[in-house]
From Swiss-Prot:
Keyword annotations from UniProtKB, A to Z: Hydrolase, Nucleotide metabolism, Nucleotide-binding
Catalytic activities: dCTP + 2 H2O = dUMP + NH4(+) + diphosphate
Functional description taken from the UniProt entry: Bifunctional enzyme that catalyzes both the deamination of dCTP to dUTP and the hydrolysis of dUTP to dUMP without releasing the toxic dUTP intermediate.
Self-association and partners: Homotrimer.
Keyword Glycosyltransferase: no
Active site (UniProt): E129 (proton donor/acceptor)
GO BP field: dUMP biosynthetic process; dUTP biosynthetic process; nucleobase-containing small molecule interconversion
GO molecular function terms attached to this record: dCTP deaminase (dUMP-forming) activity; dCTP deaminase activity; nucleotide binding
Species classification: Bacteria, Bacillati, Actinomycetota, Actinomycetes, Mycobacteriales
UniProt entry tagged with the keyword Ribosomal protein: no
Name of this chain's protein: dCTP deaminase, dUMP-forming
Domain of life of the source: Bacteria
Family recorded in the similarity comment: Belongs to the dCTP deaminase family.
Amino acid sequence: MLYSDKDIRVAIDAGELGIEPFDADLIQPSSIDVRMDRLFRVFNNSKYTHIDPKQQQDELTSLVEVPEGEPFVLHPGEFVLGSTLEKFTLPAHIAGRLEGKSSLGRLGLLTHSTAGFIDPGFSGYITLELSNVANLPITLWPGMKVGQLALFKMTSPAQAPYGSNVLGSKYQGQRGPTPSKAYLNFR
């Protein structure tokens, strides 16, 4: 079941769904808008000859914090990691799906590459996989609406929600754009 605006408000008021900072104006008919944080991870193209998911490549990306009042410029063909301004905490019976904003998609901004699903039990800031498929640079302003999170009630709560000890949830509690930890899947 997809949550409506009413369902989202009820879940927040009941303390089931955590959103910090919360702004009621972000609630849409069947989703909640998410805003861009000021932290980005850019790829260091000169440090590695290639990306190997099996290897821990700590210097593959560098953290960039955009100064107050300034944008981040995403160039054509560029891929960076961003983060939501909001921290989300989902209970064991609610899953989420992050989607881009139509108005930004029409400008060539992709909000995520493949990782739009948010598991029940997740708590943290959502990492955005930002790509510019336009032929002009796009300015990304901290605080701007960049996506929307649709919420789904599961038929029953997850027995082992994200963050459970049995799962080895690599991104639980993440703050800011978190680089890939794919190498942990090979251990």
